[in-house]
Amino acid sequence: MLRTEEMILNVGPQHPSTHGVFRLILKIDGEIIQEATPVIGYLHRGTEKIAEGLQYTQIIPYTDRMDYLSAMTNNYVLCHAVETMMGIEVPERAEYLRVLAMELGRIASHLVWWGTYLLDLGATSPFLYAFREREMIINLLNELSGARLTFNYMRIGGVKWDAPDGWIDKVKQFVPYMREKLAGYHDLVTGNEIFRERVTGVGRYTKEEAISYSLSGVNLRSTGVKWDLRKDEPYSVYDRFDFDVPVREGGDCLARYECRMAEIEQSLRIIEQACEQFPADGPIMGKLPRIIKAPPGETFVRIEAPRGEIGCYIASDGKKEPYRLKFRRPSFYNLQILPKLLKGENLANVIAILGSIDIVLGEVDG
């Protein structure tokens, strides 16, 4: 008589395809997943609690270390929240530098995802190509901020440094170069029949499920929901740029892949326009009080990060330190749908599905 037994399989917390200290407990029957339980918290550092004992400007370096693949957007959301509370006006030149930094960071983040995702699926070459192009972006951001990963570049009221001489020209030159490479990526991978067969119909969820799980960013837009805060609730100077919001209808790994690749092209469009509109001169810091104290009250702001909506809630009692600081981290919310996606799937699809969601554990754990 044929008999099967359920097996418990641990993926991680030290596993190359979890891209961080993440553990996934799988209950499997043969090759079919019966239940998936994510275990998080290995990288928890208590950022929000630490922030309660710091002045607002001292918190900025901690934001670099949440989503360390898109540190610029983390810098921005905190500064934007404090500026909103205090009514600080940011100079135009500083806003353009912020947008350029964030969009370059968005492309760099998507390149890391693209290279590692294909590596997880068994393709080595795309990983090398992605990091070749990412290195060019990191060098540009290094020239701008003095750092390669944890930039600590943005300041409440502006930015730390002005663009060095010739930096805007280098960014302009990067745009056509990246477009050419992006076309090569599509030839190599996107149109590859083996790749498309591997990810089509895998890890599918509906628009209604995406909304009920509070998914955002690409993970939401891949189900046909056209929602991007840069368009729908413009901040900084995003309302001055002409760009599209890529959406797909499939809600599967392929749809998420195509959305991210299309987003790289839109970021290039924004960068191109920002370089053309870049103010010839002007200050990079607004007028600030000598000591930054947010007035008593609370505020919540949200922006579009590479992994979705990142939000910052501040409750102030009028002191130099926040009474309470809370970040809405998109990776944390996006990860919640993983058990639903994995149930009933083949074991071989675990890494394909996890990689398509694109989480960063520093952001998940906080």
From Swiss-Prot:
Keywords: Cell membrane, Membrane, NAD, Quinone, Translocase, Transport. It is a peripheral membrane protein. Pfam families: Complex1_49kDa. It catalyses: a quinone + NADH + 5 H(+)(in) = a quinol + NAD(+) + 4 H(+)(out). SUPFAM superfamilies: HydB/Nqo4-like. The keyword Membrane applies. Its EC number is 7.1.1.-. One of its GO terms (molecular function) is quinone binding. It comes from the Bacteria. GO terms for cellular component: plasma membrane. InterPro entries: NADH_Q_OxRdtase_suD, NDH1_su_D/H, NiFe-Hase_large. Belongs to the complex I 49 kDa subunit family. NDH-1 is composed of 14 different subunits. Subunits NuoB, C, D, E, F, and G constitute the peripheral sector of the complex. This is NADH-quinone oxidoreductase subunit D. It comes from Geobacillus thermodenitrificans (strain NG80-2).
